């Protein structure tokens, strides 16, 4: 059996269950209200019930949490002076790669190929807690299907990126998310791929995942009927 199983696996490293992080870094009443209110506002903007423009802005990804938090403080103050825009901070912890490269704060928080994902998840959840405590809603791309169990309660807007929008795994995951979800058009530029993804995510699904206790589970979803929408790349002509 040793000659046919796990031939290319070097090691299995157990990881802390989501519930441990949720208990250690609980969401405060203030942050919970920020998340709940901002999800409603974003949904209203997407459906044309709120005339403001949704502006999701921030670093390409978070690698320095101290610098990221300083940015969040400045953005929070700036957002108070803008009336026609609803500002949400881009807080991306996972980076899909076309080939190879650094995969983000969760995957390798020390940027040294040690892949201390326990530390990465803890840092990510702590950072989300710090940002929402300022009153700033957050947006992130969900890449690994396990990640939402660790972080989603702090997130107001979720993204499915160009490299994963055609993936059944990510369409299923999106069908169970509790916030508005934007699907990007595919890497080849096809909008239809994202439209199909939106339709798939609006349906009910059953798929393999984990629960808050970290147990392998069959996840049954209701579908994000009123939450999915299309996101397109912006080209600035100067």
Identify what each model region corresponds to.
Residues 1-12:
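Polybasic, low-complexity association/targeting segments
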Residues 12-46:
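N- or domain-start disorder-to-order transition segments that initiate the globular core
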Residues 35, 62-63, 68, 72:
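Metallocofactor- and cofactor-centric catalytic cores in central/energy metabolism, strongly enriched
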Residues 55-57, 87-91, 138-140, 181-183, ...:
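Hydrophobic faces of well-ordered beta-strands that scaffold small-molecule active sites
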Residues 73-151, 155-156:
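A generic, well-ordered mixed alpha/beta core segment in the N-terminal half of proteins
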Residues 109-124, 157-181, 208-210:
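Acidic, His- and aromatic-enriched active-site or binding-groove loops in soluble protein domains
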Residues 228-234:
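Conserved small/polar residues in nucleotide/adenosyl-binding loops
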